[in-house]
């Protein structure tokens, strides 16, 4: 979903196809590979879509009141300082340091990266309407008619989290859902959960997982 991560996702898909993946599927099982759902970001090596939206924050319900991230509003100006003058940068560093001292590192990570819908020019902006990429993915999901299926697994490749060279299996389902227990049953105790605080990632707003759950 993040364009620049398409290189990693494409490599995984090619590896699967070139090493007998389709031929080795058990009877009654299908695998759907969705390639480059954010083609603009992939082509221009950017995280965001052509609308300058973080696709993995764009699955909020725009018919309802959007999720709020007050921490982001507090640090937005420090994250994107008005100039690169020494005094401005020092003040920005001081604001961020004060936020961390008051709320902790993990709270800062969530404030910065959890997603926000208040600053279109800011980091991790979730947009004000469904993007083309979101609508395209939702149309793919609807075409799969997945609800009658006995089991459905969704693997979404991301990069830049956790130890170097390690693929962390992250479950973003809310705690208590059957999906969380199922993920651990399938992939073992190495599965981490954002809501439980066991993941290198903090909880996120408006993730693509919501698009699957709505179907």
Residue ranges: model-predicted function:
Residues 1-215:
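Structured catalytic-domain cores with a bias toward divalent-metal coordination
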């Amino acid at each position: 979903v993040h364009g620049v991560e398409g290189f990693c996702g494409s490599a995984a898909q090619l590896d699967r196809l070139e090493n007998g993946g389709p031929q080795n599927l058990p009877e009654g099982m299908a695998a759907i590979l969705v390639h480059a759902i954010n083609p603009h970001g992939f082509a221009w090596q950017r995280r965001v879509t052509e609308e300058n939206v973080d696709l993995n924050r764009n699955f909020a319900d725009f018919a309802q009141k959007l999720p709020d991230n007050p921490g982001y509003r507090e640090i937005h100006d420090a994250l994107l300082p008005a100039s690169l003058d020494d005094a401005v940068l020092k003040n920005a560093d001081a604001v961020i340091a004060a936020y961390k001292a008051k709320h902790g590192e993990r709270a800062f990570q969530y404030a910065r990266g959890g997603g926000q819908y208040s600053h279109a020019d800011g980091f991790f902006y979730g947009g004000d309407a469904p993007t083309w990429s979101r609508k395209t993915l939702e149309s793919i999901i609807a075409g799969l008619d997945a609800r009658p299926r006995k089991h459905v697994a969704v693997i979404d490749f991301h990069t830049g989290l956790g130890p170097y060279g390690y693929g962390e299996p992250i479950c973003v389902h809310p705690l208590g859902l059957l999906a969380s227990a199922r993920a651990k049953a399938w992939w073992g105790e190495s599965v981490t959960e954002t809501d439980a605080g066991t993941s290198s990632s903090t909880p996120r707003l408006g993730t693509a997982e919501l698009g699957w759950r709505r179907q």
